[in-house]
Amino acid sequence: SVIFVPPKFAKAAVIDAIDAKMPLVVVITEGIPVHDSAFFYAYSLQKGTTQIIGPNCPGLISPEQSNVGIIPADITKRGPIGLVSKSGTLTYQMMYELRDIGFSTAVGIGGDPVIGTTHIDCLRAFQDDPDTTAIVMIGEIGGDAEERAAAFISEYVTKPVVGYVAGF
């Protein structure tokens, strides 16, 4: 399920998707109240059937295979890089810059205070993915998600990782 509704309807739309046992819900909507995001994220954990990506994210793409969200498919190709990013704009920019190398999967997780899928979730998936040989991780200032991801990388990730934290 892909959620494109206005912020005031997003909570109900995500709950409907979780109740329908959708395995993946990508929440593109920006401006969702933090309380609503916290509620539907906790609800998804309680139900245990749905993985949430976002909110306030561009989605995810495995070039030449699938695209869920608003990531333009024509800026990249299939390749060995796994990309996880909080920033939609930097997701697109990185995909464009590395277009000649290509991506196994790129995931825009969103930069809101409460998100579903995290850097660590994606790092774990890329580590386990035989089609991914290197990882690019893009973060933003605020919070400690990038620090937790760095600790996870040092302990569990054997593939090369390039990290960038935007902002100052």
Question: Where are the predicted features?
Answer:
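Catalytic-core regions of core metabolic enzymes
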Residues: 2-168
